Amino acid sequence: MIITTTENIHGYEIVEILGIVMGNIVQSKHLGKDIAAAFKTLAGGEIKAYTEMMTEARNKAIERMIDEAEKIGADAVVNVRFSSSSVMSGAAEMLAYGTAVKIKKSNE
């Protein structure tokens, strides 16, 4: 499965557009880590607990998007985008979405 943020895949031709696919997850951090993160905001700098949470959420959202694409027989997902939103304090939704397509090697 090829996943790309671009419209096209070098060396391939899109032969069929199957439609939009997406994967999402709502994830939260442990209360203790949330408290530690609150103190970190006072001092400034990276809040590693939240960086890790968002990385994990993004990866899970990609996995779920790929699962959805595979279910409809896609070879690739193009124009992949991400969106995140706060659902509640300490919890965020990560959404990965793109266009599922069938591809073939081009004759270039």
UniProtKB/Swiss-Prot annotation:
It holds the Pfam family YbjQ_1. HAMAP family: UPF0145. It comes from Thermosipho africanus (strain TCF52B). Belongs to the UPF0145 family. InterPro entries: UPF0145_dom_sf, UPF0145_YbjQ-like. It comes from the Bacteria. This is UPF0145 protein THA_1434.
